Design a protein with these regions (language model features):
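Transmembrane alpha-helices
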Residues: 1-158, 169, 186, 218, ...
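Short beta-strand/turn micro-motifs at beta-sheet edges
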Residues: 229-231
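Hydrophobic lipid-interacting interfaces of membrane-associated proteins
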Residues: 212-215
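N-terminal amphipathic/hydrophobic interface segments
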Residues: 193, 225-227
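Structural signature for solvent-exposed beta-strand/loop edge elements and short helix-capping sites
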Residues: 157-202, 206-210
Length: 362
């Protein structure tokens, strides 16, 4: 008996996408229930309007959460419905009907590739915009608004360096502000101030209790001081918000521009932007890798059935997530560059996928 490859393709593809969407819907409902239960006290304490909770937070939280864990949802989906096919001896029937194991993989890979492309599009253009509203809501009604950025060092232009001991996001003020101008490896001028407050109307910094030292006259330096001075430099208040959360709000073009600017300034926060950039590329590919692993693990009929496959699959899926988070520590500790560290989980699990695929019954 032979089977039409096209019918098998449609059958597997529909099973894949259908199970994926149903699983996704159930997980979304569970996550919203648990998340709301965890945050309900803060919603009430901060008087968050119901309309904002639904439309500003959860409507934007859902695509963020779904996209972040879509490779794992794909993996669990493949484990569940492929185990059912194997338990019902459907895979044996397909293989004995003249369709090779490699040919049977095509609808799996097509479905995984479509999900990966959708995830990539969301990563680059949709999620950043929705993150703006989600993070704004969290800052307003969930998190502590009085936060500070400490020990900031920026190169704002060739030969110009800014040093700030701390920056308060509550009043947009930099404390212990210093601006140094360097020529031929020598400091030619230095501006120091107790604080520098951002004026959003004029786009200038208002220095308070400032000192200006000019070292261009040889051994003696000229000092000028005062209580207040407005100055415009190549630094804006947005530069102090470029951390691990704010890079999530930038589309791919803006993210690339931020990376170039931060590299010029010697900004240590560039690692957050680089991690975000490589995560946006690496995560969609993991859906394809985990699909291959899922099929290889669950296509054999086992005594334990779906339960054993699902338990092992979930354990492997969460080990992937943990390893993905652990690989970022290599970036934070300067052990590996982001371009290598972020891709390590995919490379390792691609090797595992190749081994399991080779061992799968054909």
């Amino acid at each position: 008996m032979t089977f039409s490859p096209k019918k098998i393709d449609k059958y597997i593809f529909k099973k894949f996408i259908g199970t994926f969407l149903i699983s996704l819907l159930l997980i979304i409902i569970l996550v919203i229930v648990f998340d709301a239960g965890e945050k309900i006290d803060k919603f009430v304490a901060n008087e968050a309007p119901l309309r904002k909770i639904i439309f500003d937070y959860y409507l934007n939280f859902i695509p963020y959460f779904v996209n972040m864990y879509s490779p794992l949802f794909v993996f669990i989906t493949v484990i569940v419905f492929t185990s059912r096919l194997a338990a019902n001896s459907e895979i044996i029937a397909i293989l004995s009907g003249g369709i090779s194991y490699h040919r049977m993989m095509i609808p799996y890979l097509v479905a995984a590739a479509l999900i990966a492309m959708a995830s990539m599009a969301l990563n680059f253009w949709v999620i950043p915009g929705s993150n703006v509203e989600r993070l704004a809501f969290e800052n307003e009604y969930v998190k502590n608004k009085n936060t500070a950025v400490r020990n900031v060092h920026y190169q704002i232009a060739p030969g110009q360096f800014v040093f700030v001991e701390s920056f308060s996001t509550w009043n947009n003020t930099a404390y212990k502000f210093t601006l140094e101008t360097v020529e031929d490896n020598k400091i030619v001028s230095k501006v120091s101030a107790e604080s520098a407050a951002w004026d959003s109307l004029s786009g200038a910094w208002q220095l308070r209790r400032y000192f200006i030292r000019d070292y261009t006259s040889g051994l003696t330096d000229h000092v000028k001081s005062g209580l207040q001075l407005d100055t415009v430099i190549a630094l804006t208040v947005e530069d102090f918000y470029s951390n691990a959360l704010t890079v999530q709000t930038l589309d791919y073009g803006d993210l690339e521009s931020l990376i170039k600017t931060q590299k010029l300034r010697g900004d240590a926060n560039v690692m957050y932007a680089l991690i975000e950039k490589h995560n946006r590329w690496a995560m969609p590919f993991s859906a394809i890798i985990l699909t291959i692993i899922g099929v290889a693990l669950s296509s054999r009929k086992k005594r334990g059935g779906i339960g054993w496959n699902l338990a092992f699959g979930i354990a492997l899926a969460f080990s992937y997530v943990l390893f993905q988070r652990f690989s970022q520590m290599f970036v934070y500790t300067d052990v590996l560059p982001p371009g290598i560290a972020i891709w390590i989980p995919n490379v390792l699990f691609a090797i595992i996928a190749a081994i399991l695929y080779k061992m799968a019954p054909k």
